[in-house]
Amino acid sequence: MTSESTLPPVVPPLHSPKSPVWPTFPFHREGSRIWERGGGIAPRDLPSPLPTKRTRTYSATARASAGPVFKGVCKQFSRSQGHGFITPENGSEDIFVHVSDIEGEYVPVEGDEVTYKICPIPPKNQKFQAVEVVLTQLAPHTPHETWSGQVVGS
């Protein structure tokens, strides 16, 4: 007689995978740059969380571009929050401005003179926001920062 086992082979129980199953990749794509995970990226190399331009429907963009140009003064702007407010020259209610609607190389600061057009804020379109904002006169004796982080003036 041989010493072969007559017991059936041990089969591990079946387990369903945890749901949902996400493939793990060592990197993810951000625009045209590839960022390695866990590679010790310096904070200055990370992509900005702020969008560079907003996507609007053609009709909203066309209406804003065709509208009149208004003048005002920057009341407040927070680069970290990505928005601020403009006080219109005519003294009406302050108007919202988003970082993506600012033209030029400088971050607005309190007292900067600006020109802008207006666009309704969805979904109700009852309030307006400033678009195509251009700094026409920088506030005197105030340091200004460029979008790249360089401080200019004092």
From Swiss-Prot:
List, alphabetically, the SUPFAM superfamilies matched.
Answer: Nucleic acid-binding proteins (SSF50249)
Q: Where is the CSD domain?
A: 69-136
Report which superkingdom the organism of origin falls in.
Eukaryota
Phosphoserine is carried by which residues? 19
Coiled-coil segments, which residues? none
Segments of this protein annotated with the region Disordered? 38-62
Any one Gene Ontology BP term:
mRNA processing
One term of GO molecular function: RNA binding
Q: Name one GO cellular component term.
A: cytoplasm
Which PROSITE patterns is this protein grouped with?
CSD_1 (PS00352), CSD_2 (PS51857)
- One Pfam family of this chain: CSD
The principal location of this protein is nucleus
Q: Where in the cell is it found?
A: Nucleus; Cytoplasm
Q: Which UniProt keywords apply?
A: Cytoplasm, mRNA processing, Nucleus, Phosphoprotein, RNA-binding
PANTHER family cross-referenced by the UniProt entry? CALCIUM-REGULATED HEAT STABLE PROTEIN CRHSP-24-RELATED, COLD SHOCK DOMAIN-CONTAINING PROTEIN C2
What's this chain's function? RNA-binding factor which binds specifically to the very 3'-UTR ends of both histone H1 and H3.3 mRNAs, encompassing the polyadenylation signal. Might play a central role in the negative regulation of histone variant synthesis in the developing brain.
Quote the protein name from its UniProt record.
Cold shock domain-containing protein C2
Q: Which organism is it from?
A: Mus musculus (Mouse)
